[in-house]
A protein has these predicted regions:
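Amphipathic alpha-helical packing elements
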Residues: 37-73, 78
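Bacterial N-terminal signal peptides
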Residues: 13-28
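Feature captures the catalytic cores and cofactor-binding loops of soluble hydro-lyases/lyases
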Residues: 73-77, 81-232, 246-313
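Boundary at the C-terminal end of the N-terminal hydrophobic targeting segment
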Residues: 31-33
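N-terminal secretory signal peptides that target proteins for export/translocation
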Residues: 1-11
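Channel- or pocket-lining gating/hinge segments that regulate access to a cavity or pore
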Residues: 242-244
Length: 313
């Protein structure tokens, strides 16, 4: 009932201009007390290039099959496509990483907090109460998570009181998203307990304090994580180095190119194993026309094998 009440709150208020400076760009978005969200039409407009179906809230829904395929991606494979598209601000790093051996893949569910301002919070809480929501908290957003989501939280790098989850809410997030993951430009608490839960997480710091002195200002709106603007529904891919946020319109191309990159690396190492060539003769492009033709034939054969295997699953 609380989640349904939130949707009612989100959908019932009139559209107004942005109250906060960062949101001026998105004047069509709806402001509901201090809780700001995009309507389904807003999300559709701002992610219009997505080729995929959408959730009821308007977020692009990258297919489950592509999520599974994306578990094999590395940061370098993603970079190869995005830099060609001139999308050079899609990567964030410098995190503490929980379970770095476990790839993190899912659809971005974005949440924004700002430093507490009591007069704004009072109005927000009053309006929330009118719609059956006792408080606007971190759990307001967490309770909306779905399978395949990665919880993306802009807590403006806050350490003390910037703890989006402890072990209990981290466990709930793991169950709700089916081990999707968490990225927070902020902190977590109960690190010992969280470390035992099988879900990847990227966080700036750990701190024993509960979340506080902040206010929830956005759900499924553009948020900033490091130097990245993250949109709801972006494909989130995390590895040992950091996190990429891939716009949906590039997902298929990234995955296809990744196959080619892996095959190229596979062939290159085979040639190095033969011990007959200098590195410059093979990498990154074979200099000998016969070797180049050999590689192209190998690439074609392996692509056919890989795609046949995927079609059989």
């Amino acid at each position: 009932m609380r989640t349904q009440a939130l949707y009612t709150l989100v959908q019932s208020s009139s559209t107004v201009a942005f109250l906060f400076c960062a949101i001026t760009l998105f004047a069509p978005a709806s402001l509901h007390a201090q809780l700001i969200t995009f309507s389904r039409q807003d999300l559709t407009d701002y992610t219009a290039q997505s080729p995929f179906e959408r959730f009821p809230d308007g977020r692009p829904r990258v297919p489950d099959g592509l999520l599974q395929q994306a578990r094999e991606l590395s940061s370098e494979e993603v970079w190869a496509v995005l830099q060609e598209k001139n999308f050079n601000n899609q990567y964030a790093d410098g995190f503490h990483i929980l379970h770095p051996e476990k790839p993190m893949v899912g659809r971005a569910f974005t949440v924004q907090f700002m430093p507490l301002r009591s007069d704004v919070e009072h109005i927000a809480e009053t309006k929330a109460n009118e719609h059956g929501i006792l408080r606007l908290t971190n759990q307001t957003a967490i309770d909306m998570l779905q399978p395949g989501d990665v919880l993306i939280v802009d807590l403006f790098g806050k350490k003390v009181g910037g703890t989006i989850v402890g072990d209990n809410l981290f466990y709930y997030t793991m169950k709700a998203t089916r081990s999707g993951g968490l990225v927070v430009d902020g902190s977590i608490r109960d690190l010992n307990g969280i470390s035992e839960i099988d879900m990847p997480a990227y966080f700036r710091s750990a701190d024993p304090t509960p979340i506080g002195n902040v206010m929830l200002t956005g759900i499924n709106v553009p948020v900033r994580i490091g130097g990245v603007t993250v949109m709801p529904g972006d494909l989130v891919v995390g590895d040992r180095e950091g996190v990429y946020f891939i716009p949906p319109q590039f997902v298929k191309e990234v995955l296809d190119r990744a196959d080619e990159i892996r095959i190229h690396d596979e062939w290159t190492k085979k040639k190095f194993d033969e011990g007959k060539y200098k590195s410059s003769e093979i990498y990154s492009t074979p200099k000998d026309p016969k070797l180049l033709q050999e590689y192209q034939e190998y690439l074609k054969k392996r692509l056919e094998e890989i795609r046949k295997q995927r079609n059989q699953k």
